[in-house]
């Protein structure tokens, strides 16, 4: 097999392959003979179809398969011998004017780039930290109490206030016509908790059971109901019942209902703190990991293989269509979505992936079995039966591969933080959790 390699662009290469026709024909004959043993054709007994008949019927398709296989094998061998790391699939075309007894192909493809990572000691990384405070524990307990609240009807004549559960009938009209979803009876919601539009809650707040009120309500431009978005409706609402919320006391009974073994408030707070600390750890790691990756990419020089970018765009496009389909959008799989919408994100992902892969290779940051086990144990710790979760992860290679990817990212994060110029910044628990 004759092979030549040519550089076309920064990452684009061309391999010219010449294969002897005798080798191709020999393989075609061999496959046709195997096919003749099993092929069934009218007028012939199984395995007794003459070779010339088999060749006439299947010769073209078998020759096509053999050419594909032989060229693919030759390309893989040539790329390997030339130490070329191929990115994506090659574009293979047959050349005219091949020497007698030969068939010649051009394979045009891209290679993965050389990744140059600069001096990480000059990289600036802001590393955040946060603590679980008593206030955070108190807030979590309040949330747990709200989840277990009960309601009792208020005395007649008592106005509705924030935290109350109200039962109402309402009807909204736009230009005198009731619209879809604009009418309901015995509808319940909690006042002041954002379950309804602010104007609706403001109108109901202060009303008493048995009272009715009319008021205008302007739907926001970005309202999810497209038929009413940006329009103003006239509402009639009647309050039928007002119920006050009663939160359980923070005591042994609450602790036991939440599964605290010793049934003490101290045990409850300790359990909440442990869970919050686990969540804080994961969120801090995610935030700091993002800062590290941005710093790492800023110190790297590389060209992006278009084949890898296009493949990533295709994945993002497929994900977007799947999301539209899940939302109930009709013909989501045929939706016209411009590829360029995803190009910046695809380029970032490909660039980061190549840089991380090079750092891992150059510094042996691969996940060890001990690290995998420790990470899975940590993930399983928050479940009722951790041992079942551990078995679930280790029982599937794909799930374990996802854990391995996370551990490698953690190794990269620790490596860069050890080398870079790190600025420590303490933030509040609420800021980390994205709470106001």
Swiss-Prot record:
Pfam families: FKBP_C, Trigger_C, Trigger_N. The keyword Lyase does not apply. PROSITE patterns: FKBP_PPIASE. Disulfide bonds: none annotated. It catalyses: [protein]-peptidylproline (omega=180) = [protein]-peptidylproline (omega=0). InterPro entries: PPIase_dom_sf, PPIase_FKBP_dom, Trig_fac, Trigger_fac_C, Trigger_fac_C_sf, Trigger_fac_ribosome-bd_bac, Trigger_fac_ribosome-bd_sf, Trigger_fact/SurA_dom_sf. GO terms for cellular component: cytoplasm. Its EC number is 5.2.1.8. The keyword Transcription does not apply. SUPFAM superfamilies: FKBP-like, Triger factor/SurA peptide-binding domain-like, Trigger factor ribosome-binding domain. Residues 163-248 form the PPIase FKBP-type domain. It is found in: Cytoplasm. GO terms for biological process: 'de novo' cotranslational protein folding; cell division; chaperone-mediated protein folding; protein transport; protein unfolding. GO terms for molecular function: peptidyl-prolyl cis-trans isomerase activity; protein folding chaperone; ribosome binding. Keywords: Cell cycle, Cell division, Chaperone, Cytoplasm, Isomerase, Rotamase. It comes from the Bacteria. NCBIfam families: tig. Consists of 3 domains; the N-terminus binds the ribosome, the middle domain has PPIase activity, while the C-terminus has intrinsic chaperone activity on its own. Involved in protein export. Acts as a chaperone by maintaining the newly synthesized protein in an open conformation. Functions as a peptidyl-prolyl cis-trans isomerase. Belongs to the FKBP-type PPIase family. Tig subfamily. This is Trigger factor. It comes from Paracidovorax citrulli (strain AAC00-1) (Acidovorax citrulli).
């Amino acid at each position: 097999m004759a092979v030549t390699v040519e550089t076309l662009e920064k990452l684009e290469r061309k391999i010219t392959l010449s294969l002897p026709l005798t080798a191709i024909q020999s393989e075609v004959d061999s496959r046709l003979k195997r096919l003749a043993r099993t092929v069934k054709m009218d007028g012939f007994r199984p395995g007794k179809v003459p070779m010339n008949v088999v060749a006439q019927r299947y010769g073209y398709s078998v020759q096509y398969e053999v050419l594909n296989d032989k060229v693919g094998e030759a390309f893989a061998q040539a790329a390997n011998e030339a130490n070329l790391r191929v990115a994506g699939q090659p574009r293979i075309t047959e050349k005219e004017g091949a020497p007698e007894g030969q068939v010649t192909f051009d394979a045009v493809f891209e290679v993965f780039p050389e990744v140059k990572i600069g001096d990480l000691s000059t990289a600036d990384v802001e590393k955040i930290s946060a603590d679980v405070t008593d206030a955070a524990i108190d807030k979590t307990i309040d949330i747990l109490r709200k989840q277990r609240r009960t309601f009792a009807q208020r005395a007649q004549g008592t106005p509705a206030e924030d935290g109350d559960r109200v039962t109402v009938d309402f009807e909204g009209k736009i230009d005198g016509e009731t619209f879809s979803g604009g009418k309901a009876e015995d509808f319940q919601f909690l006042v002041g908790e954002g379950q309804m539009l602010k104007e609706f809650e403001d109108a109901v707040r202060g009303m008493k059971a048995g009272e009715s009120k009319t008021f205008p309500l302007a739907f926001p431009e970005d309202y999810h109901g497209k038929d009413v978005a940006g329009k103003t409706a006239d509402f009639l609402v009647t309050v039928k019942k007002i119920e006050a919320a009663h939160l359980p006391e923070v005591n042994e009974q609450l602790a036991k209902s939440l599964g605290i073994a010793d049934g003490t408030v101290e045990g409850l707070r300790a359990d909440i703190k442990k869970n919050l600390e686990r969540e804080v750890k994961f969120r801090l790691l995610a935030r700091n990991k993002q800062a590290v990756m941005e710093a790492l990419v800023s110190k790297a020089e590389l060209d992006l293989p278009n084949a890898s970018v296009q493949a990533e765009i295709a994945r993002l496009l497929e994900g977007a269509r799947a999301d539209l389909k899940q939302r109930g959008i009709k013909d989501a799989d045929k939706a016209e979505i411009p590829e360029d919408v995803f190009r910046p994100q695809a380029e970032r992902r490909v660039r980061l992936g190549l840089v991380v892969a090079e750092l891992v290779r150059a510094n042996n940051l691969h996940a060890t079995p001990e690290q995998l086990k420790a990470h899975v144990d940590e993930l399983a710790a928050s479940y009722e039966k951790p041992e079942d979760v551990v078995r679930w992860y280790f029982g599937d290679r794909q799930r374990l591969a996802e854990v391995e990817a996370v551990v490698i990212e953690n190794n990269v994060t620790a490596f860069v933080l050890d080398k870079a110029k790190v600025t420590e910044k303490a933030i509040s628990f609420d800021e980390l959790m994205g709470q106001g």
